[in-house]
Amino acid sequence: MGSEMCIRDSLWKCIENRGESNKRTLAGNICESNELIDENNWFFNNILVDLVNQYASSFINLGNTVPTSCRHSYVLDTMWVNFQKQNEFNPVHNHSGVYSFVVWMKIPTTSSEQNSNPIARDSNLPCIGNFAFQYQNIVGDIKSFYYEMSPEMEGGMVLFPSKLMHAVYPFFNCQEERISISGNISLDTSNALF
């Protein structure tokens, strides 16, 4: 629990010290998104490197699929914070880089309360307020995997291949913001490993 609080505190500090607007580079239909600085590469070195290594040992090292003439280390290329208000959303999109991540810092709604709204109540695909990955299965069907949002997801994180399509659905009837941090991990082509 102590290390989780340390990580969250570090990320909240990044948010407090946020930089310029990042909206022009994002697919999001949201009012506020800002660049973040990972001071002294703390988050990258203490969290992301281990997660990338775990992903590579469990599945495949996606960096090996990038055509380069030599090996390169990873670098946290970009990191930003999104302040999502009700009715705002991120349409289906992917990212640049090799790996991407999202950390949910504040979730003011629950999936169950959102899906009790009249527009979703009788839906055969209730998804408002959720985060979703979209992918093609082995027979070519487009499928979705949903993360049902709730305050219990605060501090949760997902690392995924940057090219994996994903979306953030809007939430309704809540004046509080949803706050999330996202970023892209790329190969550092300025530094070759031999």
What does each model-found stretch correspond to?
Residues I15-K23, E154, T189:
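Long protein-protein interaction modules used by eukaryotic assembly/scaffold proteins
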Residues L26-G97:
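Signature of the catalytic double-stranded beta-helix
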Residues T78-M157, E176, N191:
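Catalytic core of non-heme Fe(II) oxygenases with the double-stranded beta-helix
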Residues N90-H93, H166-F172:
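Short beta-strand His + acidic residue motifs that chelate non-heme Fe in jelly-roll/DSBH
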Residues F171-I181:
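Short, compositionally biased
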